[in-house]
Amino acid sequence: MSDYSQLDKYVEPDLEKMALIEDVRPMMKLESSYIEMNDYDFNYDQVEYKQCREVASVKSIKICPKCKKRFDAVENFCPDCLVTLKYPQDMDSIKGIEINSKIEFKGSGNSSNILTDDNIELICNFDFTIDDFNDIVHSIKAQGFKNLDNAIKDNSIDLDSLNILDKVLLFAKAFVSVEYKSYGEDLGYFQFNKIYVDDRQRKSLQITTLIHELSHFLLKEFLVHTTCKILDVNKNRHVEAVIIYILSNSSFNSLIDEYAAHSVEGRFTIFGYQDYSSFTAIQKDLDSEHVDIAKTIGNTFAIYIKELLEGFLDWDLREDIKTQFLKDTTESPDYRQLQLENCNKLSDEGFIKAIWLILSEGFQNCNIEVVKRYMEEF
């Protein structure tokens, strides 16, 4: 493994995350706190009151399925289209809508053999800056939002009429394909440019699963586009297969990836309810120093992912997610695992060095046969 200790001098505190955790620190020593629920009336404890707003009453409406005009619930027909009005929840589901979620990178070539000595040398020399990385994040965000805009127009979607799960689902599908599974114990997973979600679960868990798995996709895209930029090639399945290999065949890189997704998910859920098992199993394979720096790198990736997501998941939608979470849960929060959180990030210079270490070591140690098998999945 590369010497990641050289990144120690670039570590700095993530003040925003520290402040969020500091708000609940007094609760970490308590065994539990109880949330009493009765339909839409919530009695929040001190922490939940800070994190959630009260549910606002929403006027009941109906929508014309043809022109999408909104009517009071007492109306039955659209006078212009002469069709029966429907309640928003009875409209065609976002689940069944096909969206073009293509995210591209345009280079000057389309090499079918990425793992050449010349390319490995280019990766190791790493002519890449933080400005290049910011351009990549902006490009991915712009393409995703264009896909979202096209989907809304092509399907005449009324965003205001969607529930919070459908809004998050629509946003996720603008970046990556989403499919549903009805077996296994996992809430969901990301694999070869597809997110799989168990739709038997509560809405709140489907929402956080979508955010978690979308984060895996975006981190993968960051590294794919970085590689394409350095090698000056179009995005293709060869590059994607190499990056999937790098992220999945090293406990260190897997922890970076998993902790990043965990940290992003935590931005949109409620402290005390998040599942930590996604990364605790991985970190058992690493010593404490490698665990700390892997989490710091993952947390830095998470900052960029969160900023991208917050372009759509603004304050109001984040509060809607938290409110949905409280409506669904009957469990008491457990703050003890917050001690596993990492509140550090890397400076710009340190972050670029971290990406260099990940890619240079990964390219040099790639198993070509495994990469070929991965290529067949795209």
Enumerate the predicted regions with their spans.
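Auxiliary, metal-adjacent structural segments of Zn-dependent hydrolase domains
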Residues: I103, L115-I195, R200-K203, Y374-F378
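Post-HEXXH active-site segment of zinc metalloproteases
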Residues: S204, K220-I256
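Short Cys/His-rich micro-motifs in 6-15 aa windows
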Residues: L82-D92
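Short cysteine-rich clusters marking metal-coordination/redox-active sites
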Residues: C64, C78-C81
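Residues immediately within or flanking Cys/His clusters that coordinate Zn2+
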Residues: I61, E75
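Pan-zinc metallopeptidase signature
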Residues: S278-F378
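Short alpha-helix carrying the canonical HExxH Zn2+-binding catalytic motif
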Residues: K203-L219
